[in-house]
């Protein structure tokens, strides 16, 4: 156990004061030093609970990149079917038929221990299985007929990999560096796990940026004149953050932040789902609480209804053959939706008040309130915030779904040396107080919450007993007075302390918090110079270096499988299109078919039917090469017959095939 050495308080206080004075300057130098590296194109990714978004800065402008469906936001869903992995829209669209193998809300699991209360509460609502593996939650899904487990980092990596692919398809080149956003209230372990997910996805995550800070950049990029105090109210699908910032001349300084990493649109949906479970049971005597397929259908329709209620006063939820052949048909009014969720809506006001108190400001000193996240479209949420700020109208100049990715892309532009953003400076803060346990179980603070980062703080401690050879450094985050009531981040020992009376040895403990909010702690015996340190890794919740390397290999294997499947489907489609095109032509009695000799026509149709039968019998099981062989076989029959009809026949099989081989629209 450690004790606090009071004799060095004044010295430490002076050092701390000096640190704060020089911090804005050192932060600016840090950002600009990073931007001198040659990273190539750096994309910005908003890795959301329910939806993700990717942007890039090109020629001084930010572009939000649409996915292959033309959508600018992509569902944070991963699904495993019998023969493929789906990510994004395709995964979400099939959840009703495949609920136990469709993974979503993974952001609510990442960086947690399995026995965390929030995780135990969360997994009760999920249709897929969450298991305990070495103290951390892993999800279980059936892949190619076998049960396989995935860490939250792996699933997040699949989503990040999808966003990476979207950017690469758009840019036409490989992307290896990114800025990724996280909720401001994410703790150290959650930030580390998010960086690990990026590594597994083949991305070097240059910066972890807090979501409200990124949104503030989107809001304030073109507002470089007078100083403004703004509040960013970020209510997304699964997390909630509030940050109070000062914006002036390209500098974005966070003064205070607060939030709840388990509050968002998914919670509002679940309240409505729970309501309709009771209604259906009362009407039909059937409890669907454990029916994953019925729940997936209901959840999907409830989410649609919630969106509708943002612009209408009521809507109707209709689901054919909901369960046991019974149709579901119920109305939902905006008033009922608000009644079911009012306590959750009001719960968001507490962090708003907290950031004002921490920054020592009043509501009327705030120049603008910026809404971010899809859940801020809920009319009652808007009304509550406007009333809180005495009728102040909410700023609606930025897209709440895209603002975070926009800001991340700007930060990516800063790091890659894009023109027009040279003067942008981010000064963010740590969301929670950091300290160590000292004698009596007390939490002794080294870095207070809302301290600007990056930062470093040192303090001298001593031994609690005579001749104590070892001190245990236990690192905590949280606001409670006793260490046991806070969150243990990690611990390590400093050994080999020479025998001495209690209180004599001087142990210097140093906390270093980097610009990503990731903590390193060191302890040095000033008498012997002996030291030890750790980068906080939350041993029970974080992947080891070896595990990360293994996950990278598995991710590459999945990517290869995806590539092989895509090539197989392309070959299958090419054969199918070619066969059907030939068949239609051969049967056209007013055109091509009328010119064929009867024997040739019969030979051609036999070959076509053989190819179509092969497709029908081997649609899922044949390989790419087998589909290609069938197409070549059909081509060898078709070519001599079709070439008779032309004065100038094609010079090769390949040219002939091109006449018939077209992608379907």
Swiss-Prot record:
Chief localization: endoplasmic reticulum
Region (Substrate-binding (SBD)): 410-510
Catalytic reaction equation(s): ATP + H2O = ADP + phosphate + H(+)
Protein activity control: The chaperone activity is regulated by ATP-induced allosteric coupling of the nucleotide-binding (NBD) and substrate-binding (SBD) domains. In the ADP-bound and nucleotide-free (apo) states, the two domains have little interaction. In contrast, in the ATP-bound state the two domains are tightly coupled, which results in drastically accelerated kinetics in both binding and release of polypeptide substrates. J domain-containing co-chaperones stimulate the ATPase activity and are required for efficient substrate recognition.
Database matches in PROSITE patterns: ER_TARGET, HSP70_1, HSP70_2, HSP70_3
Location of this chain's protein in the cell: Endoplasmic reticulum lumen
Composition bias, Acidic residues: 652-665
Listed GO biological process terms: response to unfolded protein
Coiled coil residues, start to end: none
GO MF annotation: an example: ATP hydrolysis activity
Binding site for ATP: 48-51, 107, 237-239, 303-310, 374-377
Range of residues in the leader sequence: 1-33
Location of region: Disordered: 644-665
EC number, UniProt record: 3.6.4.10
Keywords from the UniProt entry: ATP-binding, Chaperone, Endoplasmic reticulum, Hydrolase, Nucleotide-binding, Signal, Stress response
InterPro entries the UniProt entry points to: ATPase_NBD (IPR043129), BIP_NBD (IPR042050), Heat_shock_70_CS (IPR018181), HSP70_C_sf (IPR029048), HSP70_peptide-bd_sf (IPR029047), Hsp_70_fam (IPR013126)
GO CC field: endoplasmic reticulum lumen
Region ranges (Nucleotide-binding (NBD)): 136-290
Enzyme's top EC category: hydrolase
Alphabetical list of Pfam families matching this protein: HSP70
Motif segment (Prevents secretion from ER): 662-665
Function per UniProt: Probably plays a role in facilitating the assembly of multimeric protein complexes inside the ER. Is required for secretory polypeptide translocation. May physically associate with SEC63 protein in the endoplasmic reticulum and this interaction may be regulated by ATP hydrolysis.
Protein family (similarity comment): Belongs to the heat shock protein 70 family.
Protein name: Endoplasmic reticulum chaperone BiP
The organism of origin for this protein: Pichia angusta (Yeast)
Taxonomic placement: Eukaryota, Fungi, Dikarya, Ascomycota, Saccharomycotina
């Amino acid at each position: 156990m450690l004790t606090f050495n009071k004799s060095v308080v004044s010295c430490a206080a002076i050092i701390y004061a000096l640190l704060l004075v020089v911090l804005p300057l050192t932060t600016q130098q840090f950002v600009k030093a990073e931007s001198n590296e040659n990273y190539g194109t750096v994309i910005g990714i908003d890795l959301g609970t329910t939806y993700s978004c990717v942007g890039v800065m090109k020629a001084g402008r930010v572009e939000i990149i649409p996915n292959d469906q033309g959508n600018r936001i992509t569902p944070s869903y991963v699904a495993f079917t019998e023969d493929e992995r789906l990510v994004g829209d395709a995964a979400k669209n099939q959840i009703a038929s495949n609920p136990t193998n469709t993974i979503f809300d993974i952001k609510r699991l990442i960086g947690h221990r399995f026995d965390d209360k929030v995780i135990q509460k969360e997994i009760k609502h999920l249709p897929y299985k969450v298991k305990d593996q070495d103290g951390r939650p892993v999800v279980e899904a059936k892949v190619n007929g076998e049960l396989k487990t995935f860490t939250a980092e792996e699933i997040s990596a699949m989503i990040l990999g999808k966003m990476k692919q979207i950017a690469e398809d758009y840019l036409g080149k490989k992307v290896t560096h990114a800025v990724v956003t996280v909720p401001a209230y994410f703790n150290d372990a959650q930030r580390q796990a998010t960086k690990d997910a990026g590594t597994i996805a083949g991305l070097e995550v240059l910066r972890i940026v807090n979501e409200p800070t990124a949104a503030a950049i989107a809001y304030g990029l073109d507002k470089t004149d007078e100083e403004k105090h703004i509040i960013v109210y970020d209510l997304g699908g699964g997390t909630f953050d509030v940050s109070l910032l000062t914006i002036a001349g390209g500098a974005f300084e966070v003064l205070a932040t607060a939030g709840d990493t388990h509050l968002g649109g998914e919670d509002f949906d679940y309240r409505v789902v729970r309501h309709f479970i009771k209604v259906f049971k009362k009407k039909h005597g059937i409890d669907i609480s454990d029916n994953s397929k019925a729940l997936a259908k209901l959840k999907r329709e409830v989410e649609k209804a919630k969106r509708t209620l943002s612009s209408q006063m009521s809507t109707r939820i209709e689901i054919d053959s909901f369960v046991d052949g019974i149709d579901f048909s119920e109305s939902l009014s905006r008033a009922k939706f608000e009644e079911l969720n009012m306590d959750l809506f009001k719960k968001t006001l507490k962090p708003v008040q907290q950031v004002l108190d921490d920054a020592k400001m009043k509501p009327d000193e705030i120049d603008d309130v910026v809404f971010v996240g899809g859940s801020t479209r809920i009319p009652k949420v808007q009304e509550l915030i406007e009333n809180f700020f005495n009728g102040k109208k909410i700023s609606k100049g930025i897209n709440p779904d895209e603002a975070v990715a926009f800001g991340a892309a700007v930060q990516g532009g800063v790091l890659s040396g894009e023109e027009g953003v040279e003067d942008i400076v981010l000064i963010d803060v740590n969301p929670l107080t950091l300290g160590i346990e000292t004698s009596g179980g007390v939490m002794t603070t080294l870095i207070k919450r809302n301290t600007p980062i990056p930062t470093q703080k040192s303090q001298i401690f001593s031994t609690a007993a005579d001749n104590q050879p070892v001190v245990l450094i236990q690192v905590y985050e949280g606001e409670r007075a006793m260490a046991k009531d806070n969150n243990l981040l990690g611990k390590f020992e400093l050994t080999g302390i020479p025998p001495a009376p209690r209180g004599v040895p001087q142990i210097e403990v140093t906390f270093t918090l980097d610009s990503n909010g990731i903590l390193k702690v060191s302890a040095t015996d000033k008498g012997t110079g002996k030291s030890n340190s750790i980068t906080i890794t939350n041993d029970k919740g974080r992947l080891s270096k070896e595990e990360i390397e293994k996950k990278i290999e598995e991710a590459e294997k999945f990517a290869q499988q995806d590539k092989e499947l895509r090539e197989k489907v392309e070959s299958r489609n090419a054969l199918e299109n070619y066969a059907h095109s030939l068949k239609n032509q051969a049967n056209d009695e007013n055109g091509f078919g009328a010119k064929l000799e009867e024997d040739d026509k019969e030979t051609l149709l036999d070959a076509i039917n053989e190819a179509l039968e092969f497709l029908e019998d081997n649609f899922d099981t044949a390989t790419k090469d087998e589909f290609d062989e069938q197409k070549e076989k059909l081509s060898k029959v078709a070519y001599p017959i079709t070439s008779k009809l032309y004065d100038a026949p094609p010079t090769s099989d390949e040219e002939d095939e091109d006449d018939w081989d077209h992608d379907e629209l």
